[in-house]
Regions:
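Catalytic loop of the DD-peptidase/beta-lactamase superfamily, centered on the K-T-G motif
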Residues: 1-23, 27
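Canonical positions in the second alpha-helix
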Residues: 39, 73, 106-107
């Protein structure tokens, strides 16, 4: 399922979670990026957790923090269609249509059955 489990983790890993809990999103993202192997290893469900956090910010119209988190997710999980789809949505909401299109296209390239990405690109009148 989507349960997030925490294994015994080194100190480096807890720093990012503390930063997030203090609302220091960019610093938290940088801390994860700096020690990405540790975070990926020690947080099962990290991709889903970051995606959910990104959408929480997006839904609160805090697009800047959503962009930090969702971009990080594409870097940590470059083979995931969903990370590009979500980042594309945040970019679109921010008015970065050209970048949004690139991310939706990457998402569809990784998962040709991504109906949301296909729908959005069709709405934007982009050739797929």
């Amino acid at each position: 399922g989507d349960t997030i489990t925490f294994n015994k983790a080194p100190e480096d890993y807890t720093i990012s979670m503390e930063l997030f809990s203090e609302g220091k999103i960019q610093a938290g993202c940088e801390a994860i990026y700096k020690n990405k192997e540790i975070h990926i290893k020690y947080i099962n469900g990290l991709q889903n957790m970051l995606n959910a956090m990104g959408y929480n910010y997006l839904n609160e119209d805090d697009v800047e923090n959503a962009l930090h988190i969702l971009k990080l997710n594409t870097i940590l999980f470059p083979e995931s269609s969903n990370t590009y789809d979500s980042y594309g949505e945040a970019l679109r909401k921010n008015g970065n249509i050209e970048e949004a299109i690139k991310n939706y296209k990457k998402s569809i390239e990784l998962n040709p059955n991504n109906q949301n990405g296909i729908k959005v690109l069709t709405e934007l009148e982009v050739q797929i």
